[in-house]
């Protein structure tokens, strides 16, 4: 079944303006470090990101050394963006 984000997700989070850019960032970001390596099942990673987004988190911290192995967190998050969040990008 396709993922459908919570309609009230932006009401659940405080957002702060980033300088004069007009960009708003959530008060809480989600770091995808050891919980997004190849040793974590894809369904678990998918559930983490979906829940965070449903709570209004729109900023996800990634780095090329997150894993293990290094880079696997970026690959996993990219796959979730492609499959679950294409309609919200």
Model-derived regions: residue spans:
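N-terminal binding-site loop/beta-alpha segment at the start of enzyme catalytic domains
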Residues: 1-89
């Amino acid at each position: 079944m396709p993922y459908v984000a919570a309609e009230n997700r932006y009401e659940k989070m405080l957002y702060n303006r980033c300088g004069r850019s007009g960009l708003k960032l959530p008060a809480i970001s989600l770091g995808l470090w050891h919980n997004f390596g190849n040793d974590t099942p894809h369904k678990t990673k998918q559930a983490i990101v979906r829940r965070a987004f449903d709570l209004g988190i729109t900023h996800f911290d990634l780095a090329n050394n997150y894993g293990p192995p290094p880079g696997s967190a970026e690959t996993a998050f990219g796959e979730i963006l492609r499959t679950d969040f294409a309609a919200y990008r």
